[in-house]
Regions:
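Short, low-complexity N-terminal intrinsically disordered segments enriched in polar/charged residues
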Residues: 1-38, 42-46
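A solvent-exposed, acidic/Ser-Thr-rich amphipathic alpha-helical stretch
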Residues: 37-114
Length: 115
């Protein structure tokens, strides 16, 4: 079976989209654990000067330092009083409507979800 360059590009884009979707699953798991530091360390391109995070109710934070500071500060300010063992909790994450666009060069992507 010969796979041409166009088909190979389509397969790679599909694999990239799947990997990004799997990252969202990891994000939800880490949110359940209130682990903002790991969210930043594991899921953000922390060595990229253009890294950013945007939450509709909190604004946009650009650059590695601002992105990390937001993640850690947000969790500390908003979730530090919540018990970590979650005894008696019923967690439900509705993470849907994914929109993942891989750049033409395949080097970057942008993604949004309704959470």
């Amino acid at each position: 079976m010969n796979i041409g360059p166009d088909e190979l590009k389509r397969f790679q884009e599909a694999a990239d989209i799947n990997e990004i979707a799997m990252m969202l699953g990891r994000y939800v798991t880490l949110m359940d654990q209130f682990d903002a530091k790991s969210i930043y360390e594991e899921l953000f391109a922390k060595d990229d000067p253009e890294v950013s995070v945007e939450y509709d109710t909190c604004g946009t934070y650009r650059g590695p330092e601002n992105t990390r500071a937001f993640m850690v500060d947000y969790f500390h300010k908003n979730l530090s009083t919540i018990t970590r063992d979650k005894h008696g909790w019923l967690d439900f994450w509705d993470a849907g409507t994914p929109h993942i666009v891989v750049a033409e060069d395949g080097l970057t992507a942008q993604a949004t979800w309704s959470l």
